[in-house]
Amino acid sequence: PNLRASQAVEKLWEAILATSRVTEDPIAAWQAHNQDLHDRCAYLNSLHIRELHYKASNGTDFHVGMIPEARFCGGAEKSLQGIVFNPNIPSEECFISPMRGKAEGIVYSSKPLSYQSQLIDRFWIRFHEGKAVEWHAEENNDLLTKLIEMDEGSSYLGECALVPFDSPINQSGILFYNTLFDENASCHMAFGEAYPCIKNGSNMTRE
C-alpha cells in the first residue's frame, strides 16, 4: 500500500511466483512438492481417521466426522485418461470430504475471508448436526449470511483441509484477495458440494 502502482505490481508478481514455486527449476520443485503432499496424504489415510477435532486458543472447538473410505487428497492428480496434472497452483493442502450431518461445535476465523471483492473478518460459525446454524462477523456479517444461505446445500461443509503453518503463503504475510492463494495460508473448511475423494468414488453414481 505504500508503494507506487508499478512497484506494487512488481512486488505482487514476485510474491505470486515465489508462492507458486516458480524457481530456477519449477518442474523439479513441483515434483518434490507433489511427492511431499502425496506422502502426507498417504500417512493421513493410513490412520483411518473417523473424526477431526479442531481446538484453538481463539475459541475454536469443533468436531467433524469423516465419510467411511474417504481419502485425503492433495497435489498432482491423474485424470480418468491417465494424464497427471496439478489442478491448483499454488497448493499446500491435504483435503478430505466430510460426512454430511456430522459437524458439531464452533469455529473462529484466524484470517479474513475475501468474498465478492469484500472482506469478511473476525467471524465465527456454529455447527449442529452438520449444518451452520449460527454465525456472526464483525465486518460484513450480511455478506457472510448471504454466503451461508445461498442455497439448500451451502450451509453444509464440503471440504476440510489441513495446511502446514510454515506454508509459503502464510509466511509471506500477504492477503492476496484470491481464494486460491489465501486458502493455502492456513487450515480451512469450505461450504457446498464435496469432491468424490473416496475409494472408488469416480465409479459411484450420485445416488
Task: Label each region the model flagged.
Residues 1-104:
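Active-site bordering "gate/hinge" segments
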Residues 1-2, 60-63, 71-73, 114-117, ...:
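Flexible loop/turn segments at secondary-structure boundaries
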Residues 45-47, 116-119, 153, 182:
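Short solvent-exposed loop/turn micro-motifs enriched in small/polar/acidic residues
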Residues 56-58, 66-68, 111, 136, ...:
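Short, structured patches in soluble enzyme cores that scaffold and shape functional sites
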Residues 96-146:
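Long, well-ordered mid-to-C-terminal structural blocks that present hydrophobic/aromatic surfaces
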Residues 134-203:
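Dual-mode signal for accessory low-complexity, basic/Gly-rich regions
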